[in-house]
Amino acid sequence: MIRQATLNDVPAILSLVNNHAKQGLMLTKSPLDIYRNILNFIVCEQDGQVVGCARLVVLWKDIGEIASLAVADGYKRRGIGAELVKTCLRTARKIGLPRVFSLTYQTAFFNACGFKIVDRESLPHKVFGDCLKCPKVDCCDETAVIYDI
């Protein structure tokens, strides 16, 4: 079941995100990062356990980002990630956000969700705020993908 994250979900979200960060797939987050962004997070809960998360971040009036997309080991390849993305896209549509992007290593996954690969330079510079915290800021190897609502 996909649902809005609650404060009780913060430890599980933190674990999911930071486990993926240890694999070099995303940036680490502090508990404060998660608490401050809890309203942006959705989770997938199965059998009382949070097994996936994602957040939709509105960056400007015309663009948002799907970030912190993570699914627990043992639950991958079950469609959970796709459902999290679809839920973020429905929210974007509902609030009138025309474009959503992500920076990812999982281009095939995002292509299957309807995203198209774009040149990172085609994105407005304001979308790269989190990149300043990344050790790969000067040699980013993630691919930019975008979805037009």
How would you name each of these model-derived features?
Residues 43, 49-58, 63-70:
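Conserved beta-strand in the GNAT
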Residues 77-90, 102:
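Conserved acetyl-CoA-binding loop-helix of GNAT-fold acetyltransferases
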Residues 123-149:
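C-terminal "cap" of GNAT-fold acetyltransferases
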